[in-house]
């Protein structure tokens, strides 16, 4: 008699909150937010930067970063230390589930392979079967505005499966190809942003004290 092999998932995506493809013109600034679910920012074109908690980050085409639950984050086009801004296209996916393993991704930037970039394309294609999309050049998929019924059966499950594939690929990459995963390059961001980081850390440590 054949003996079954039990599949024990490392992670599981159970909820999708937002799925965006934004084409931002130079000069765009998002002041920031925090929420109780995970979020990915992937740069499809151009460069972007911002704060992930107290840590500054910079992303170029083909790179992505995780924003952890309840961690403040913001975003701007271009790079913090550059005088010249630039257009930037990004994909933003926010999601929830059994994702404790992602804690090790904190404050790291991933450079994606062709395989991983193609997963993003497949996710967007499936999103068209689940969500209304409108807003000029931007493709907006929102949980608050889904179709009553999927255009294609299983589209939501496909999005979850594809996202799990991406996360598992990044998990393996961190273990097997650390050269494609980097800690946030704080030393290259200049004194101004080091000062911002120190101020935020000070405020966090003295949240309930008189300053």
Residue ranges and their predicted role:
Residues 96-119:
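Double-stranded beta-helix
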Residues 1-59, 63-64, 71, 103-104, ...:
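Generic protein-terminus/edge-of-domain signal
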Residues 49-51, 67, 73-84:
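Short beta-strand His + acidic residue motifs that chelate non-heme Fe in jelly-roll/DSBH
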Residues 134-139, 144-161, 167-210:
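Short, Lys/Arg-enriched, Trp-marked, Pro/Gly-tolerant hinge/linker segments that flank
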Residues 39, 74, 89-94, 111:
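Short hydrophobic beta-strand segments that form the core of ligand-binding sensory/regulatory domains
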Residues 46, 119-126, 130, 195-206:
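Solvent-exposed, amphipathic alpha-helical segments
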Residues 114-121, 125, 164, 168:
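Amphipathic alpha-helical segments that line or abut small-molecule/effector binding pockets
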Residues 66, 82-102:
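A short hydrophobic beta-strand segment most commonly corresponding to one strand
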């Amino acid at each position: 008699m054949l003996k079954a092999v039990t599949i024990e998932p490392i992670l599981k995506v159970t909820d999708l909150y937002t799925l965006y493809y934004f084409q931002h013109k130079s000069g765009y600034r998002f002041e920031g937010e925090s929420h109780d679910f995970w979020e990915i920012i992937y740069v499809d074109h151009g460069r972007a930067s911002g704060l992930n908690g107290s840590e500054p980050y910079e992303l170029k085409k083909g790179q992505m970063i995780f924003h952890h639950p309840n961690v403040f984050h913001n975003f701007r086009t271009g790079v913090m230390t550059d005088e010249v801004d630039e257009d930037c296209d990004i994909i933003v996916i926010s999601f929830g589930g059994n994702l404790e393993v992602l804690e090790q991704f904190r404050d790291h930037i991933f450079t994606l392979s062709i395989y991983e970039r193609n997963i993003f394309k497949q996710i967007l294609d499936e999103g068209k079967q689940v969500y209304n999309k409108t807003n000029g050049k931007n493709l907006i998929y929102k949980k608050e505005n889904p179709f009553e019924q999927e255009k294609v059966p299983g589209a939501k499950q496909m999005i979850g499966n594809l996202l799990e594939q991406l996360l598992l690929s990044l998990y393996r990459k961190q273990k097997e190809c650390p050269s494609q995963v980097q800690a946030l390059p704080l030393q290259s961001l200049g004194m101004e942003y080091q000062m911002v980081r120190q101020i935020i850390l000070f405020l966090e440590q003295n949240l309930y004290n008189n300053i």
